[in-house]
Design a protein with these regions (language model features):
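Catalytic loop of short-chain dehydrogenase/reductase
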Residues: 1-18, 23-24, 28-32, 46
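A short small-residue
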Residues: 1-5, 53-59
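Short beta-loop-alpha junction of Rossmann-like oxidoreductase domains
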Residues: 8, 35, 39-54
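Short, low-complexity, polar/charged sequence segments that are solvent-exposed and flexible
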Residues: 14-17, 56-60
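C-terminal helical subdomain
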Residues: 32-35, 39-44, 59-101
């Protein structure tokens, strides 16, 4: 939502875009102090009990990698953490391979 608004999501999209702008400002302010700030976009359902309970297509999506495994998200956050300063990522966009965008 921080990168693209959707119909009926005006409030959510504007808030997410504000979060992105905040992350950009923090990255510029804190980068010179050796603090890595990254904006991570997770455009997906994450495999939790709550998602399992509300998603009628859960079984189908989990079998086809349509729902993100929390461990795989954690691997991406470790990737950000371990980056050398000369190649910091500011924005990381995570989504299942079959997500339409």
């Amino acid at each position: 939502a921080s990168m693209r608004g959707g119909a009926n999501f005006a409030a959510f999209a504007s808030a997410k875009n504000g979060l992105r702008a905040l992350a950009q400002s923090m990255a510029r302010e804190l980068g010179p102090k050796n603090i890595h700030v990254a904006h991570v976009i997770i455009d997906a359902a994450v495999d939790t009990e709550w998602i399992k309970s509300i998603n009628p297509e859960y079984d189908k999506k989990i079998k086809t990698d349509g729902i993100v495994n929390p461990s795989h998200l954690a691997e991406n956050y470790l990737y950000l953490y371990d980056q050398p300063r000369d190649a910091w990522t500011f924005e990381l966009d995570l989504r299942p391979w079959q997500e339409t965008w």
